[in-house]
Amino acid sequence: MLPAYLPNNFAALTGGGMPIDMGRNWTDGRRILGDGKTIRGFVGGVTAGILIGAVQMYAEISGLVPWFPPHTLTAVILLAIGSLLGDMVKSFFKRRQGIDRGGEWFLVDQLDFVVGALLLTLLFDPIWMLNTMTIPLLIVILVLTPLLHRTVNIIGYKLGLKKVPW
């Protein structure tokens, strides 16, 4: 899941510049996504996800981590892209709900990227997904991700890397 976990962090670190929505508003007069979703951040986040996935694949192939499930390059790319697409879909709906950038949306903020990553991977690499993601593993991911997400965000907040701890 590292190719899905890292892109959001690296999107924030590498972001800035042109927003993906090009500053446009939806029919409700609110921004489609907002200034926090940028082209540079998307590219940086996906790149980081693919790089960590490549490192994982190397570690798996060379026998350094025999307990890791085998990854395919396709799955790594889909997990990384799906992670950021899930985050963008969440941002779209947050704007529709009137929740500003940085505003908290409990559990949705913690699971959006995982759901996006898993759904995109299921759609385009179903064989890998069905062979790798067992029901017990999915339950562990869905339970531990919010805790991990919150912990990492609190650390980022305390280090001054995030404006809010969620």
Swiss-Prot record:
Output a single Gene Ontology CC term carried by this record: plasma membrane
Q: Name one GO molecular function term.
A: CDP-2,3-bis-(O-geranylgeranyl)-sn-glycerol synthase activity
EC code:
2.7.7.67
Q: How does it sit in the membrane?
A: Multi-pass membrane protein
Localization per Swiss-Prot or TrEMBL:
Cell membrane
Q: Tell me the leader sequence span.
A: none
Which cofactor(s) does the record list? Mg(2+)
Q: Does the keyword tRNA processing apply?
A: no
Catalyzed reactions: 2,3-bis-O-(geranylgeranyl)-sn-glycerol 1-phosphate + CTP + H(+) = CDP-2,3-bis-O-(geranylgeranyl)-sn-glycerol + diphosphate
Spell out the InterPro entries in the cross-references: CarS, CarS_archaea
Kindly name one Pfam family recorded for this protein. CarS-like
Pathway, according to UniProt? Membrane lipid metabolism; glycerophospholipid metabolism
Key words of the record: Cell membrane, Lipid biosynthesis, Lipid metabolism, Magnesium, Membrane, Phospholipid biosynthesis, Phospholipid metabolism, Transferase, Transmembrane, Transmembrane helix
Question: Which residues are listed as membrane-spanning?
Answer: 39-59, 61-81, 104-124, 127-147
Kindly indicate whether the keyword Amino-acid biosynthesis belongs to this entry.
no
GO aspect biological process, one term:
glycerophospholipid biosynthetic process
Q: Which NCBIfam families match?
A: PRK04032.1 (NF003114)
- Free-text function comment from the UniProt entry: Catalyzes the formation of CDP-2,3-bis-(O-geranylgeranyl)-sn-glycerol (CDP-archaeol) from 2,3-bis-(O-geranylgeranyl)-sn-glycerol 1-phosphate (DGGGP) and CTP. This reaction is the third ether-bond-formation step in the biosynthesis of archaeal membrane lipids.
Family indicated by similarity: Belongs to the CDP-archaeol synthase family.
* PANTHER family membership: CDP-ARCHAEOL SYNTHASE
Q: What is this protein called?
A: CDP-archaeol synthase
Lineage in the entry? Archaea, Methanobacteriati, Methanobacteriota, Stenosarchaea group, Methanomicrobia
Q: Which gene encodes it?
A: carS
